[in-house]
């Protein structure tokens, strides 16, 4: 896996992250010393990507568990409070909730203070390895949908630095590279924080994958002029009926895919599904600081005091999605029934 940059490292009971806000200018690794720093790292997007946030949150909980003192009951209460604080950092992505739910069960069921952090550590490491395998399997299924020479458009960053390895939407491009299959990627810059420009092009170029950067308002023209054959995106939350929350701008890509008659794919692990929500109407959409829109590199790009609407995500209705690609396979024409048939017992 030498082609991948590790965005989360857990060694010697310490969590270290690649500060993604400094890319592409600098590869800076930040050691996480305490919970407040970890929460700030999530909120300020130094660590980002739904799977990566969940893995990071798990390791932070482990790190805190090894530092607990007092009785078993006190340690349990303290760690459940830590878990709740981590969960509150990013309301839209569901992966973090799913990971913390698993770890919370271990906290509640622990019978000795000594075993508590050890069991949490084992589970967090297991989840990290599972995510790497899951991402690769998503890539395997996604690659089957593409042909040699395809030109595929994506938004934001659903790559290796947003997961343990490979990524979700970018996984097929890594596998195509490994197998010598030529695919071209067009990366939409992804305003206002430029994850497509700063992160996706950085990691794909680093891996030797053919990638071209475009601005967000070039998408329709690019689909037409460059004969884009498909669009693939990641996801932060998928409801029971297949409605998908992802980076703001995804919904309009789905509409353009429908207009041009090209497939629109969502690539995501089972941990991104929220089976407690029937539709996208139930998803809480995070709104972020206005300065992300009114400033660039600390300089004003809009007049002071102008009202700003800055949602971080939008919801793409399931009927605009050609297929959802998971580690279990491809869910074509996603809705409640097709998702249930593919995922089966995982819906319960």
Swiss-Prot record:
Keyword Ribonucleoprotein annotated: no
A Pfam family: IF-2B
Active-site residue numbers: 236 (proton donor)
Coiled coil: none
Pathway: Amino-acid biosynthesis; L-methionine biosynthesis via salvage pathway; L-methionine from S-methyl-5-thio-alpha-D-ribose 1-phosphate: step 1/6
InterPro entries registered for this protein in UniProt: IF-2B-related, IF-M1Pi, IF_2B-like_C, Initiation_fac_2B_a/b/d, M1Pi_N, NagB/RpiA_transferase-like
Assigned EC number: 5.3.1.23
Keyword annotations of the record: Amino-acid biosynthesis, Isomerase, Methionine biosynthesis
Protein's job: Catalyzes the interconversion of methylthioribose-1-phosphate (MTR-1-P) into methylthioribulose-1-phosphate (MTRu-1-P).
Family of the protein in this entry: Belongs to the eIF-2B alpha/beta/delta subunits family. MtnA subfamily.
The protein's name in its UniProt record: Methylthioribose-1-phosphate isomerase
């Amino acid at each position: 896996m030498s082609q991948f940059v590790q965005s989360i490292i857990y060694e010697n009971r310490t969590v270290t992250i690649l500060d993604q806000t400094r890319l592409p200018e600098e590869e800076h690794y930040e050691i996480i010393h305490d919970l407040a720093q970890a929460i700030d790292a999530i909120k300020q997007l130094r660590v980002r990507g739904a799977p990566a946030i969940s893995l990071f949150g798990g390791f932070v909980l482990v790190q805190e568990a090894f530092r607990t003192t007092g009785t078993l009951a006190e340690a349990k209460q303290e760690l459940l409070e830590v878990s709740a604080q981590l969960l509150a950092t990013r309301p839209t992505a569901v992966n973090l909730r799913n990971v913390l739910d698993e770890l919370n069960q271990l906290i509640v069921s622990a019978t000795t203070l000594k075993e508590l952090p050890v069991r949490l550590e084992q589970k967090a490491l297991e989840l990290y390895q599972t995510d790497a395998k899951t991402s690769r399997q998503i890539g395997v299924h996604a690659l089957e949908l593409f042909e040699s020479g395809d030109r595929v458009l994506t938004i934001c960053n659903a790559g290796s630095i947003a997961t343990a390895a490979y990524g979700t939407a970018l996984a097929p491009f890594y596998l195509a590279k490994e197998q010598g299959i030529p695919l071209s990627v067009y990366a939409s810059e992804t305003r206002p924080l430029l994850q497509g420009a700063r992160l996706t092009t950085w990691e794909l170029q680093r891996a030797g994958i053919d990638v071209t950067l475009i601005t967000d308002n070039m998408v329709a023209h690019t689909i037409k002029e460059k004969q884009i054959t498909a669009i693939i995106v990641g996801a932060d939350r998928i409801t029971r009926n297949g409605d998908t929350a992802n980076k703001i701008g995804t919904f309009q890509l789905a509409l353009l895919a429908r207009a041009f008659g090209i497939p629109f794919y969502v690539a995501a692990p089972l941990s991104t599904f929220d089976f407690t929500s029937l539709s996208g109407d139930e998803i809480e959409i995070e709104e972020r600081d206005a300065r992300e829109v009114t400033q660039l590199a600390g300089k004003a790009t809009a007049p002071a005091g102008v009202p700003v609407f800055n949602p971080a995500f939008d919801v793409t209705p399931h009927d605009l999605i050609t297929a959802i690609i998971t580690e279990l396979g491809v869910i074509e024409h996603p809705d409640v029934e097709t998702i249930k048939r593919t995922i089966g017992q995982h819906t319960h």
